[in-house]
Amino acid sequence: MKDIHLKNSLKLSLVTLSRESEDKFISKFEKVIKLVNKISNFEVQINFNANKKKISTLREDKVEFSLSIEAIKKLSNSFLDGYFSSPKILE
Protein backbone atom coordinates (compact mmCIF):
# COMPACT_ATOMS: atom_id res chain seq x y z
CA MET A 1 0.00 0.00 0.00
CA LYS A 2 1.24 3.45 -0.81
CA ASP A 3 2.43 5.57 2.11
CA ILE A 4 0.28 8.47 0.94
CA HIS A 5 -2.91 6.47 1.58
CA LEU A 6 -1.77 5.55 5.06
CA LYS A 7 -0.79 9.12 5.87
CA ASN A 8 -4.16 10.37 4.61
CA SER A 9 -5.97 7.75 6.69
CA LEU A 10 -4.12 8.84 9.81
CA LYS A 11 -4.79 12.50 9.02
CA LEU A 12 -8.52 11.91 8.52
CA SER A 13 -8.78 9.91 11.74
CA LEU A 14 -7.47 12.91 13.71
CA VAL A 15 -5.16 10.52 15.57
CA THR A 16 -1.64 11.48 16.55
CA LEU A 17 0.64 8.48 16.99
CA SER A 18 4.21 7.95 18.05
CA ARG A 19 6.52 6.50 15.40
CA GLU A 20 6.32 3.06 17.04
CA SER A 21 2.51 3.17 17.22
CA GLU A 22 2.36 4.43 13.65
CA ASP A 23 4.46 1.47 12.48
CA LYS A 24 2.11 -0.93 14.31
CA PHE A 25 -0.89 0.80 12.79
CA ILE A 26 0.57 0.58 9.29
CA SER A 27 1.29 -3.13 9.72
CA LYS A 28 -2.24 -3.87 10.96
CA PHE A 29 -3.83 -1.60 8.37
CA GLU A 30 -2.01 -3.37 5.55
CA LYS A 31 -3.19 -6.76 6.88
CA VAL A 32 -6.79 -5.53 6.90
CA ILE A 33 -6.49 -4.20 3.35
CA LYS A 34 -5.03 -7.52 2.17
CA LEU A 35 -7.95 -9.39 3.77
CA VAL A 36 -10.48 -7.05 2.17
CA ASN A 37 -8.81 -7.53 -1.21
CA LYS A 38 -8.87 -11.30 -0.71
CA ILE A 39 -12.57 -11.23 0.21
CA SER A 40 -13.40 -9.05 -2.80
CA ASN A 41 -12.06 -11.79 -5.10
CA PHE A 42 -14.81 -14.23 -4.05
CA GLU A 43 -17.73 -14.56 -6.41
CA VAL A 44 -20.93 -14.50 -4.42
CA GLN A 45 -24.41 -14.75 -5.83
CA ILE A 46 -26.97 -12.85 -3.84
CA ASN A 47 -30.27 -14.58 -3.21
CA PHE A 48 -32.74 -11.93 -2.15
CA ASN A 49 -35.48 -14.48 -1.53
CA ALA A 50 -33.42 -16.16 1.20
CA ASN A 51 -33.46 -12.95 3.25
CA LYS A 52 -37.20 -12.31 3.12
CA LYS A 53 -38.96 -12.20 6.46
CA LYS A 54 -42.49 -11.55 7.44
CA ILE A 55 -43.00 -8.17 8.99
CA SER A 56 -44.31 -9.85 12.13
CA THR A 57 -40.93 -11.56 12.68
CA LEU A 58 -39.02 -8.30 12.75
CA ARG A 59 -38.14 -6.76 16.09
CA GLU A 60 -40.01 -3.78 17.39
CA ASP A 61 -38.18 -0.50 17.61
CA LYS A 62 -37.51 0.60 21.16
CA VAL A 63 -36.55 4.04 22.36
CA GLU A 64 -33.39 3.69 24.41
CA PHE A 65 -31.22 5.99 26.49
CA SER A 66 -28.77 8.07 24.49
CA LEU A 67 -25.86 10.30 25.39
CA SER A 68 -26.57 13.93 26.10
CA ILE A 69 -25.02 16.61 23.92
CA GLU A 70 -22.80 17.62 26.84
CA ALA A 71 -21.48 14.05 27.15
CA ILE A 72 -20.86 13.91 23.40
CA LYS A 73 -18.93 17.21 23.50
CA LYS A 74 -16.52 15.63 25.98
CA LEU A 75 -15.63 12.88 23.47
CA SER A 76 -13.84 15.27 21.13
CA ASN A 77 -12.29 18.69 21.15
CA SER A 78 -13.48 19.23 17.56
CA PHE A 79 -17.22 19.45 18.36
CA LEU A 80 -18.70 22.63 16.91
CA ASP A 81 -22.33 23.75 16.59
CA GLY A 82 -23.66 20.24 17.22
CA TYR A 83 -21.30 18.51 14.77
CA PHE A 84 -17.85 16.94 14.82
CA SER A 85 -15.53 18.85 12.53
CA SER A 86 -13.19 16.81 10.37
CA PRO A 87 -10.24 17.52 8.12
CA LYS A 88 -10.89 18.61 4.57
CA ILE A 89 -11.31 15.46 2.47
CA LEU A 90 -11.56 16.87 -1.04
CA GLU A 91 -8.88 19.17 -2.29
Curated annotation (Swiss-Prot):
GO BP annotations, alphabetical order: regulation of translational fidelity; translation
Catalytic activity: L-glutamyl-tRNA(Gln) + L-glutamine + ATP + H2O = L-glutaminyl-tRNA(Gln) + L-glutamate + ADP + phosphate + H(+); L-aspartyl-tRNA(Asn) + L-glutamine + ATP + H2O = L-asparaginyl-tRNA(Asn) + L-glutamate + ADP + phosphate + 2 H(+)
EC category name: ligase
GO function term, MF aspect, one: glutaminyl-tRNA synthase (glutamine-hydrolyzing) activity
The EC number(s) this enzyme carries: 6.3.5.-
Stretches that traverse the bilayer: none
Keyword hit for Transferase: no
InterPro entries: Asp/Glu-ADT_sf_sub_c, GatC
Keywords: ATP-binding, Ligase, Nucleotide-binding, Protein biosynthesis
Subunit structure comment from the entry: Heterotrimer of A, B and C subunits.
Family: Belongs to the GatC family.
NCBIfam families assigned to the protein according to its UniProt record, in alphabetical order: gatC (TIGR00135)
UniProt function note: Allows the formation of correctly charged Asn-tRNA(Asn) or Gln-tRNA(Gln) through the transamidation of misacylated Asp-tRNA(Asn) or Glu-tRNA(Gln) in organisms which lack either or both of asparaginyl-tRNA or glutaminyl-tRNA synthetases. The reaction takes place in the presence of glutamine and ATP through an activated phospho-Asp-tRNA(Asn) or phospho-Glu-tRNA(Gln).
Name by which UniProt lists this protein: Glutamyl-tRNA(Gln) amidotransferase subunit C
Species, as recorded: Borreliella burgdorferi (strain ATCC 35210 / DSM 4680 / CIP 102532 / B31) (Borrelia burgdorferi)
